[in-house]
């Protein structure tokens, strides 16, 4: 009988794509997937390790499986493999800390999972740690992959890694330097997905605005280089190529870095009707003191000008962003400036996080760490402000006619809403799933709309 494998996928959409690739390779090798852990010969946990909360969720998921094996809820001889960012980040420590785990793999070993499982089952492994140094792997259009998203929406990972050195972020140390796929390869994957019925292509990477820059030959890009198709493939040239594909679909931009935006990129979004009027631009703060300490290579005036230019060039666009509160050295003046900025720009979609002190980052050893009570208070103040603005934004939509993509019976999303991140729209049950529809908003509670 073929081996049966269960998989738990944690973390972001980029990690979800890695899970899809693992499943694709397992199926190609003749193994069977199961959603029921108690029936699995092998359990795989694809982990996140971005912040403390993600690490704890990953450890809890691993230990839940260990306890289930011990108390008889899962097979006693079931094997456990830990994959993803937690394994990569703590590759030296985890084998000793988690002796119950049968193998550890990182992002570079996801295509080798079937062979590793075979070795684990045959008890031929010499070392439980299969992770080999820095990450270099990048998928291509033909990579075996079983999509875990609804049939009408898909993620395309256009690059891996990150060349930024944000003081709070561990990702470059986990995922390695930025590595772009070719534009032809991305377009080919998109064409295949659209032919299969996909209506929404979500472009993802650690930083999609850096796309193509690592392949430029005229001069080496830096952390402030702007999107520029005259120097080679870029996000702007990719959007134009994707927009030219036949069919009715959205192209959604997630994970852009403000430092790389250019007039060309803004113009490409405005000129391409298939690009959703939605951009994700994590700003993190507005105070120059904080932006400098975070090493975001931007400043407050630059950010304000960028936002005004985007809204002027692309009327009706939704700007999604995130902020960090309680970063080391943040003063009450810095916090107040952030609050006033949020009030002034009234982002269509926004989230806030308290600073997570991550060992291995530059921020970990910074002086003037903010007390946890102060962080919590500032977080609560910002959350209340964002909630009020969300309510006001929702009320402004009542009476408007909007285009939605139906995700499930009675549930849809607008152009302003990314899957599993933003809001939803309650729509008539008769609307066909996986198709676009035009509806009129009749009620709103924050980002959650009702329409008919």
UniProtKB/Swiss-Prot annotation:
Name the top EC class. Answer: transferase
Q: Name one Pfam family in it.
A: UPF0004
Q: Where is the signal peptide?
A: none
* Single annotated GO MF: metal ion binding
InterPro entries in alphabetical order: Elp3/MiaA/NifB-like_rSAM, Methylthiotransferase, Methylthiotransferase_CS, Methylthiotransferase_N, Methylthiotransferase_N_sf, NA-bd_OB-fold, Ribosomal_uS12_MeSTrfase_RimO, rSAM
Keywords on this record? Answer: 4Fe-4S, Cytoplasm, Iron, Iron-sulfur, Metal-binding, S-adenosyl-L-methionine, Transferase
Which compartment or compartments is the protein found in? Cytoplasm
Domain TRAM per the UniProt entry, residue ranges: 395-452
| Cofactors (names) | [4Fe-4S] cluster
Cofactor stoichiometry and binding remark: Binds 2 [4Fe-4S] clusters. One cluster is coordinated with 3 cysteines and an exchangeable S-adenosyl-L-methionine.
Q: What does the record give as the reaction this protein catalyses? A: L-aspartate(89)-[ribosomal protein uS12]-hydrogen + (sulfur carrier)-SH + AH2 + 2 S-adenosyl-L-methionine = 3-methylsulfanyl-L-aspartate(89)-[ribosomal protein uS12]-hydrogen + (sulfur carrier)-H + 5'-deoxyadenosine + L-methionine + A + S-adenosyl-L-homocysteine + 2 H(+)
Looking up SMART domains in the UniProt record yields:
Elp3
Q: In its keyword annotation, does this UniProt entry include Chloroplast?
A: no
Q: Which residues bind [4Fe-4S] cluster 1?
A: 12, 48, 85
Instruction: Give the main location.
Output: cytoplasm
Give the EC number(s) listed in the UniProt record.
2.8.4.4
Residue limits of the Radical SAM core domain? 148-392
Q: Where is the MTTase N-terminal domain?
A: 3-122
Q: Name one GO biological process term.
A: tRNA modification
A single GO CC term for this protein reads: cytosol
Task: Name the positions where [4Fe-4S] cluster 2 binds.
Answer: 162, 166, 169
Q: Which HAMAP family match?
A: MTTase_RimO
| Role played | Catalyzes the methylthiolation of an aspartic acid residue of ribosomal protein uS12.
Q: Which NCBIfam families match?
A: 30S ribosomal protein S12 methylthiotransferase RimO, MiaB/RimO family radical SAM methylthiotransferase
Give the protein name, as stated in the record.
Ribosomal protein uS12 methylthiotransferase RimO
Species of origin = Akkermansia muciniphila (strain ATCC BAA-835 / DSM 22959 / JCM 33894 / BCRC 81048 / CCUG 64013 / CIP 107961 / Muc)
Q: Which gene encodes it?
A: rimO
């Amino acid at each position: 009988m073929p081996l049966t494998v269960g998989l738990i996928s944690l973390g972001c959409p980029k990690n979800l794509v890695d899970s899809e690739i693992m499943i694709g390779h397992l199926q190609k090798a003749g193994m069977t997937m199961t959603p029921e852990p108690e029936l699995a010969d092998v359990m795989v946990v694809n982990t996140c390790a971005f912040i403390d909360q993600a690490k704890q969720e990953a450890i809890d998921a691993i230990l839940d499986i260990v306890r289930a094996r011990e108390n008889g809820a899962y097979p006693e001889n079931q094997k456990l493999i830990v994959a993803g960012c937690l394994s990569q980040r703590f590759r030296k420590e985890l084998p000793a800390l988690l002796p119950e785990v049968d193998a550890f793999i990182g992002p570079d070993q996801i295509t080798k999972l079937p062979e590793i499982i075979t070795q684990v089952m045959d008890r031929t492994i010499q070392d439980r740690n299969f992770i080999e140094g820095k990450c270099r792997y990048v998928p291509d259009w033909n990579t075996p992959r079983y999509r875990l998203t609804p049939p009408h929406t898909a993620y395309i990972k256009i690059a891996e890694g990150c060349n930024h050195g944000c003081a709070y972020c561990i990702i470059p140390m986990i995922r390695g330097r930025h590595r772009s796929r070719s534009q032809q390869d991305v377009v080919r994957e998109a064409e295949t997905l659209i032919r299969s019925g996909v209506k929404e292509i979500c472009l993802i990477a650690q930083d999609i605005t850096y796309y193509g820059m690592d392949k430029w030959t005229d001069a080496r890009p830096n952390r402030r280089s702007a999107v520029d198709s005259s120097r080679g493939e870029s996000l702007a040239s990719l959007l134009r190529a994707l927009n030219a594909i036949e069919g009715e679909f959205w192209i959604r931009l997630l994970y852009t870095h403000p430092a790389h935006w250019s007039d060309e990129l803004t113009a490409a979004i405005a000129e391409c009707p298939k690009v959703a009027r939605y951009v994700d631009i994590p700003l993190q703060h507005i105070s120059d003191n904080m932006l400098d300490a975070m090493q975001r290579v931007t400043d407050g005036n630059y950010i304000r000008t960028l936002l005004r230019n985007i809204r002027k060039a692309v009327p009706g666009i939704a700007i999604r962003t995130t902020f960090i509160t309680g970063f080391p050295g943040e003063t009450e003046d810095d916090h107040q400036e952030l609050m006033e900025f949020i009030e002034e720009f009234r982002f269509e979609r926004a989230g806030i996080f308290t600073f997570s002190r991550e060992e291995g980052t530059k921020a970990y050893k910074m002086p003037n760490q903010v007390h946890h009570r102060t962080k919590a208070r500032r977080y609560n103040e910002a959350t209340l402000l964002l909630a009020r603005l969300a309510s006001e934004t929702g009320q402004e939509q009542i009476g408007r006619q909007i285009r939605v993509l139906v995700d499930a019976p009675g549930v849809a999303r607008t152009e302003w809403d990314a899957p599993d991140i933003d809001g939803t729209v309650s729509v008539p049950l008769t609307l066909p799933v996986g198709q676009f529809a035009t509806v009129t908003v009749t009620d709103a509670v924050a980002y959650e709309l009702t329409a008919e």
